[in-house]
A protein has these predicted regions:
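Parallel beta-helix/beta-solenoid
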Residues: 75-83, 96-144, 204
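Leucine-rich solenoid repeat scaffolds
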Residues: 331-371
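N-terminal extracellular ligand-recognition/capping segment immediately after the signal peptide
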Residues: 32-34, 38, 42, 50-78, ...
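Boundary at the C-terminal end of the N-terminal hydrophobic targeting segment
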Residues: 17-23
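Intrinsically disordered, low-complexity Ser/Thr- and acidic-rich flexible linkers and loops
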Residues: 177-197, 222-228, 275-281
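Short glycine/acidic-rich loop motifs that flank beta-strands on beta-rich extracellular proteins
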Residues: 64-67, 83, 88-95, 119-125, ...
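Bacterial N-terminal signal peptides
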Residues: 4-16
Length: 371
């Protein structure tokens, strides 16, 4: 009897474990009430108390109600969609926005799989707020021509990968922020409270093209308030073509730009702000193992406007058409720059203030051969 009871208890325990391991069925957004797909997604999330996957089926949807995704829930829900789900945002705010939840901490929020199309009046496609652990992947984000495809505001330790981001003002813009310490929490450059910089953001394996301002823009919209620079962000393996500008770091520390494909942008890699002083400087940026197609319309592949301890190595280029003053690297203000082992084939490897040459010795910089 004891053996039978033990076996029965063991089998019930295993069945309970199996039931707990079974994934919860996705909730179709179209099954919820609402005025449009944005409103329906919001209602579906409320119905399951943020404890489910809300799924957007294939279809063409027009919506003006912003999708609100609450942060700090640590992996209890996600927003997923079919690749054939096309969401056309007609509003003037953020198509998908996040809000800080009832407690601080990680979110483990996942947004994936569908197409998000904007309009010239929209602020952004996806607006991420301060938290840890958000992933945006396998998305198409296009047409936010007056704003940002993805706006990263004070977010930490998050991943943006394998997306097509095109025809936006900025593909991905990262900004610091300050948030109130009392609820309801408000964040913004004019708010008094706790500072959040964008740190450890990993932007990898995306195609970011035809941005009218920048493909990737670390924008220092506010300094002071105890804010640090944007720290140790990673931009790797991206295809950055035909943008007005590719990557611009205004105020950063330890950012890595690696193994990207650059072609056809008016400006490619820009480090620091002209005459910005220490408040707007790139500290310790690493620009490594990237490829550049060099053309006349892009005078410089890498611009060091104001940087300290920049490391530039292992990059290569294919020279198409060049002008007499094209330079692989143009330096305005820098200290302790290390440039080596780059496969440079154009006439001028280095320029100082737009004129072929290097800074005078004594600033701690090292410049090695072109090839």
């Amino acid at each position: 009897v004891r053996l039978i009871a033990f076996l029965l208890a063991a089998s019930l325990y295993l069945l309970n474990l199996h039931a707990q391991a079974l994934p919860q069925a996705a909730v179709p957004a179209t099954s919820a009430a609402g005025t449009d797909i944005g409103d329906r997604v919001n209602h579906a999330l409320k119905t399951c108390a943020l404890q489910c996957t809300v799924y957007i089926p294939p279809g063409n949807y027009s919506f003006s109600v912003s999708i609100h995704l609450e942060l700090n829930t640590f992996g209890t829900y996600k927003l997923s969609g079919d690749p054939g789900a096309v969401l056309n945002y007609t509003g003037a705010g953020d198509a998908i926005t996040t809000s800080i939840g009832n407690q601080a901490g990680s979110s483990q929020l996942l947004i994936e799989g569908f197409q998000l199309r904007g309009n010239p009046h929209a602020a952004s496609g996806i607006h991420l707020m301060p938290t840890n652990r958000i992933t945006v992947r396998n998305m198409v984000i296009i047409g936010f021509s007056g704003g940002d495809g993805i706006l990263v505001e004070g977010t930490n330790s998050s991943n943006i990968y394998d997306n097509l981001i095109a025809n936006n003002k900025n593909g991905i813009r990262l900004i610091p922020t300050v948030c109130t310490t009392t609820r309801p929490i408000r964040c913004g450059p004019s708010v008094e409270g706790y500072p959040y910089a964008t740190n450890a953001i990993h932007v990898t394996d995306n195609q970011i093209t035809t941005s009218t301002q920048w493909a990737i823009f670390e924008d220092a919209v506010v300094i002071g308030h105890g804010l640090t620079e944007a720290m140790n962000n990673l931009y790797m393996g991206n295809n950055l073509e035909a943008n007005a500008g590719a990557i611009y770091l205004t105020r950063s520390r330890g950012t890595v730009i690696s193994a990207n494909y650059f072609e056809g942008s008016g400006r490619e890699v820009v480090l620091g702000v002209v005459n910005g002083g220490g408040g707007y400087r790139a500290y310790g940026p690493v620009v490594r193992d990237n490829y550049f197609t060099t053309i006349t319309a892009t005078p410089y592949n890498i611009e060091i406007q104001d940087a300290d301890s920049a490391l530039i190595e292992g990059n290569s280029e294919l020279v198409g058409s060049i002008a007499p003053k094209n330079c692989f690297v143009n330096i305005l203000t820098s200290t302790r720059t290390w440039i080596s082992k780059n496969a440079i084939y154009q006439k001028n490897a280095y320029c100082l203030n737009g004129v072929p040459g290097t800074p005078p010795s004594g600033d701690g910089s090292f410049f090695f051969g072109q090839h």
